[in-house]
Curated annotation (Swiss-Prot):
Free-text note regarding domains: The M4 transmembrane segment mediates tetramerization and is required for cell surface expression.
Gene (UniProt): Gria1
Entry-listed glycosylation sites: N63, N249, N257, N363, N401, N406
Regulation (activators, inhibitors): Glutamate-gated receptor activity inhibited by DNQX (6,7-dinitroquinoxaline-2,3-dione).
GO cellular component: AMPA glutamate receptor complex; asymmetric synapse; axonal spine; cell body; cell surface; cell-cell junction; cytosol; dendrite
Lineage of the species this protein comes from: Eukaryota, Metazoa, Chordata, Craniata, Vertebrata
Positions of S-palmitoyl cysteine lipidation: C603, C829
Extracellular side: 19-536, 631-805
Protein name as it appears in the record: Glutamate receptor 1
PTM annotation, UniProt: Phosphorylated at Ser-645. Phosphorylated at Ser-710 by PKC. Phosphorylated at Ser-849 by PKC, PKA and CAMK2. Phosphorylated at Ser-863 by PKC, PKA and PRKG2. Phosphorylation of Ser-863 is reduced by induction of long-term depression and increased by induction of long-term potentiation. Palmitoylated. Depalmitoylated by CPT1C and upon L-glutamate stimulation. ZDHHC3/GODZ specifically palmitoylates Cys-603, which leads to Golgi retention and decreased cell surface expression. In contrast, Cys-829 palmitoylation does not affect cell surface expression but regulates stimulation-dependent endocytosis.
Length: 907
């Protein structure tokens, strides 16, 4: 039974995990003609996809100008559970489509003409032409011209031209040719000829444009003196042979550069697929709308692959819902798909493919082509940053050799010392010259090696880049790259997995790790007995016990060993026949010997026996090692001011609650703790996310200020490089403690699929090999440091000895001298009292005993006096004289019998 249950659970979990992201993605397609080149390009692009998930098309052929039919087909595909719809629209159906997409949260990817809409669920593949057209008109200095347009494309381009005309005093004649017949064309150009209007802008789709040009040729309005600007992105798709022969000047725009590597490779695959799949389609050269269709399929593929890598669940469960329900029920996963589509960036058939937050193309390049009687040539290019760049300037900058050099790139960065800082006199400079710092110089070196021009822009929200867990949107510099507002990020941007899924990184230009910043603790004042610090308290206790133990062992060994006993030398005149044995190592002498040896001073006595000398030898060896070790450490402990840090590691932070700690609110450090599976870091993350007040800060500067003002009650977790830099800045009151918690690196970021990735990567490697990266770090970290050499790196500072360092030694000296005086006084008092008691007892001896003693003392001494009891031996065999002390001779003793002093007897 347990095995069955385990098998069931395993199968269930597998089903759930597998359902998180489908292997097959249904996508819709709305095409006006099954035999169109766009339809063939759609199929061809699907056949080129190899990475999962697999895109399965649901294609409907529809009249794109019929609102009812478009509504029916759109709702039909939505009910089938498609994840996104690719298709075309016209002026009559565009509003209906955008309304449905916004209400149902279904993404619609289209190569049709751009429309001005705030609906973020409509992704417009075709670049806008308004600004490019105005730049070309301005380049030719046209003041009076005719604007022929097709109302089916909308009026956005015309409106922008008329607004500019009002600003620049242009004379513009606008003509709508939506319903113009052949006779109408004839009358139109006859009227223009009368007014001598020979400068004409034609704004039409390719099919209608070919018809208009045919009428121009038929009416012979294509001779010398006529100049036509074609507001169309497919200049090479149009047959202009008649114009070339007659001498008219024709200028236009070309979106697809067929000589580039990627279009050339795809074109080769395009041609080889002709004979197998789509024999009735002209494959000589795809139209720009077909190229947009191909890129549109790749946009969807890239988006779903990104969602799959990020493990975002977009599975459609149950019924897809009613398209015409009132109110409309939006699809829950639609917003995730919409964000993924907008974040896509790659080099496709139409160049750099990326979108802004409104779903419109951005950072694209249009090639400006001109045809005269001598042939077709490229006269320049246009992009959003540089506007129109003539071919001469293009050639000076390197021509068409590299697409990297064709525009000014936006380099996003963040104000963070010492990476990017405003100069003190920044208001006196413009552009990139306003900034200084490590990353400013690095960006300049990268641009010099790659060979492109750039403009530094500070990220508006002041964040590095993190993904909002609710909206799934990216902020900071990562968001700038993801949403196409910047081309490169040169900043202290950490390389992480979640960021690598949406942007590309170069090789690391700096290695680092997460570290702990705390307020530098006050230097501990040396204690009175700091000379005891070289040895631990336990060692001092062991030394005391060893001293006592050695003294006791020496005393016992000396008592037991017969070789420690010896005869005392007698005074001259004494009887030397008596041999009394003595031992110099009593308990006090043993203590004195051990103390003298420990102090390396010695004493007047030494062991005589082998056992005693063994005890003395091992004690001398012990004291030699202890004293040498103590002396070696004493200098360092007395001359170094030490700082006691309350925190030394992440473990210390995790196991206490008195000191708060936090990270940057949006950054890789916070993401590291959130994703970590290490017990210590999980515990720290649990504390940080639930701490009140919040321990997270918006900027590194805010974290630094909080550390300084919290009086040691807040620790800030940040990258080690920034920690080391702040430690070198005044007021020099922060410090880095412990080692790094992880190992990672800073990298230069580019959008996914950017052409800059490889050149930038090679430039970083070259700068590293040249040693320039190390030079830059030394320059901005240490050469410009404000805390002195090593001032911020060392927790200890060597200085001269002061009285406070050795005060304890003087205290012990003074105490010892005082103790000696006190003991001497006690000894004197004790001896005086003892003598007084002894003399008092002597004076009370009976008169007869005194007389007898006197008589005895007058007798001549003989050799047997000592043996007969007239003398005695004292301690250690010394003979005690029986004569009265001199002091006693002057003491008046009273006789018991007569009451007279002894001195009065005349004795």
């Amino acid at each position: 039974m347990p095995y069955i249950f385990a098998f069931f659970c395993t199968g269930f979990l597998g089903a759930v995990v597998g359902a998180n992201f489908p292997n097959n993605i249904q996508i819709g397609g709305l095409f006006p003609n099954q035999q169109s080149q766009e339809h063939a390009a759609f199929r061809f692009a699907l056949s080129q996809l190899t990475e999962p998930p697999k895109l399965l098309p649901q294609i409907d052929i529809v009249n794109i100008s019929d609102s009812f039919e478009m509504t029916y087909r759109f709702c039909s595909q939505f009910s089938k559970g498609v994840y996104a719809i690719f298709g075309f629209y016209e002026r009559r159906t565009v509003n209906m489509l955008t309304s449905f997409c916004g209400a149902l949260h279904v993404c619609f990817i289209t190569p049709s003409f751009p429309v001005d809409t705030s609906n973020q669920f409509v992704l417009q593949l075709r670049p806008e032409l308004q600004e490019a057209l105005i730049s070309i008109i301005d380049h030719y200095k046209w003041q009076t011209f005719v604007y022929i347009y097709d109302a089916d494309r909308g009026l956005s381009v015309l409106q922008r031209v008329l607004d500019t005309a009002a600003e620049k005093n242009w004379q513009v004649t606008a003509v709508n040719i939506l319903t113009t017949t052949e006779e109408g064309y004839r009358m139109l150009f006859q009227d223009l000829e009368k007014k001598k209007e020979r400068l004409v802008v034609v704004d039409c789709e390719s099919e209608r444009l070919n018809a208009i040009l045919g009428q121009i040729v038929k009416l012979e309005k294509n001779g010398i003196g006529y100049h036509y600007i074609l507001a169309n992105l497919g200049f090479m798709d149009i047959d202009l042979n008649k114009f070339k022969e007659s001498g008219a000047n024709v200028t236009g725009f070309q979106l697809v550069n067929y000589t580039d590597t990627i279009p050339a490779r795809i074109m080769q695959q395009w041609r080889t697929s002709d004979s197998r799949d789509h024999t009735r389609v002209d494959w000589k050269r795809p139209k720009y709308t077909s190229a947009l269709t191909y890129d549109g399929v790749k946009v969807m593929a890239e988006a779903f692959q990104s969602l799959r890598r990020q493990r975002i669940d977009i599975s459609r469960r149950g019924n897809a819902g009613d398209c015409l329900a009132n109110p409309a029920v939006p699809w829950g996963q639609g917003i995730d798909i919409q964000r993924a589509l907008q974040q896509v960036r790659f080099e496709g058939l139409t160049g750099n493919v990326q979108f802004n937050e409104k779903g419109r193309r951005t950072n694209y390049t249009l090639h400006v082509i001109e045809m005269k009687h001598d042939g077709i040539r490229k006269i320049g290019y246009w992009n959003e940053d540089d506007k129109f760049v003539p071919a001469a300037t293009d050639a000076q900058a390197g021509g068409d050799n590299s697409s990297v050099q064709n525009r000014t790139y936006i380099v996003t960065t963040i104000l963070e010392d010492p990476y990017v800082m405003l100069k003190k006199n920044a208001n006196q400079f413009e552009g990139n010259d306003r900034y200084e710092g490590y990353c400013v110089e690095l960006a300049a070196e990268i641009a010099k090696h790659v060979g492109y021009s750039y403009r530094l822009e500070i990220v508006s929200d002041g964040k590095y880049g993190a993904r909002d867990p609710d909206t799934k949107a990216w902020n900071g510099m990562v968001g700038e790259l993801v949403y196409g507002r910047a081309d490169v990020a040169v900043a202290p941007l950490t390389i992480t997995l979640v960021r690598e899924e949406v942007i590309d990184f170069s090789k690391p230009f700096m290695s680092l790790g997460i570290s702990i910043m705390i307020k530098k603790p006050q230097k501990s004042k040396p204690g009175v007995f700091s000379f005891l610090d070289p040895l631990a308290y336990e060692i001092w206790m062991c030394i005391v016990f060893a001293y006592i133990g050695v003294s006791v062992v020496l005393f016992l060994v000396s008592r037991f060993s017969p070789y420690e006993w010896h005869s005392e030398e007698f005074e001259e005149g004494r009887d030397q026949t008596t041999s009394d044995q003595s031992n110099e190592f009593g308990i006090f002498n043993s203590l004195w010997f051990s103390l003298g040896a420990f102090m390396q001073q010695g004493c007047d006595i030494s062991p005589r026996s082998l056992s005693g000398r063994i005890v003395g030898g091992v004690w001398w060896f012990f004291t030699l090692i202890i004293i040498s070790s103590y002396t070696a450490n004493l200098a360092a402990f007395l001359t170094v001011e030490r700082m006691v840090s309350p925190i030394e590691s992440a473990e210390d932070l995790a196991k206490q609650t008195e000191i708060a700690y936090g990270t940057l609110e949006a950054g890789s450090t916070k993401e590291f703790f959130r994703r970590s599976k290490i017990a210590v870091f999980e515990k720290m993350w649990t504390y940080m996310k639930s701490a009140e007040p919040s321990v997270f800060v918006r900027t590194t500067e805010e974290g630094m200020i909080r550390v300084r003002k919290s009086k040691g009650k807040y620790a800030y977790l940040l990258e080690s490089t920034m920690n080391e830099y702040i430690e070198q800045r005044k007021p020099c009151d922060t410090m880095k403690v412990g080692g790094n918690l992880d190992s990672k690196g800073y990298g230069i970021a580019t959008p996914k699929g950017s052409a800059l990735r490889n050149p930038v990567n090679l430039a970083v490697l070259k700068l590293n090999e040249q040693g320039l990266l190390d030079k830059l770090k030394n320059k901005w970290w240490y050469d410009k440091g404000e805390c002195g050499s090593g001032g911020g790196d060392s927790k200890d500072k060597t200085s001269a000895l002061s009285l406070s360092n050795v005060a304890g030694v003087f205290y012990i000296l003074i105490g010892g001298l005082g103790l000696a005086m006190l003991v001497a006084l006690i000894e004197f008092c004790y001896k005086s009292r003892s003598e007084s008691k002894r003399m008092k007892g002597f004076c009370l001896i009976p008169q007869q005993s005194i007389n007898e003693a006197i008589r005895t003392s007058t007798l001549p001494r003989n050799s047997g006096a000592g043996a007969s009891g007239g003398g005695g031996s004292g301690e250690n065999g010394r003979v005690v004289s029986q004569d009265f002390p001199k002091s006693m001779q002057s003491i008046p003793c009273m006789s018991h019998s007569s009451g007279m002093p002894l001195g009065a007897t005349g004795l």
